[in-house]
């Protein structure tokens, strides 16, 4: 990303919510607002935000290859922190794309919560059947 010094200040943390949770969604909201102001939100920009997930996924894969030394030309060229950082970038890119296609961060947060709840029910059923 480019210079973020023009972003508005982060919202203060609510006492009843975990700091990480608030910071993630606050960061997503601020990033989406910044991207919307800079690039708009036409179909092309939406596609670019979706492609960003694939780009970050490729970087995570490259970090894993570097971590395991699977490329004999490079050997071990990455550490665990690089892999973790790239995986975090995948998550952030996905949340930004989710907020873009759902119409905003509150909608994305709600959809993700419902999706996780649905997956939890499914996992419970799968575990009970095992």
Can you say where each PLM-predicted feature lies in the sequence?
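Flexible "arm" and connector segments at domain edges
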Residues: 2-130
């Amino acid at each position: 990303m480019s210079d973020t010094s023009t972003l508005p200040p982060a919202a203060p943390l609510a006492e009843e919510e975990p700091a990480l949770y608030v910071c993630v969604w606050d960061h997503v909201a601020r990033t989406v607002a910044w991207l919307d102001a800079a690039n708009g939100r036409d179909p092309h920009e939406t596609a670019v935000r979706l492609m960003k997930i694939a780009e970050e996924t490729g970087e995570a894969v490259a970090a894993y290859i570097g971590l395991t030394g699977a490329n004999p030309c490079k050997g071990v060229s990455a550490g665990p922190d690089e892999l973790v950082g790239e995986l975090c970038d995948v998550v952030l890119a996905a949340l930004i794309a989710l907020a873009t296609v759902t119409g905003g961060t509150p909608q994305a947060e709600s959809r993700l919560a419902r999706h996780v709840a649905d997956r939890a029910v499914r996992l419970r059923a799968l575990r009970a059947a095992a």
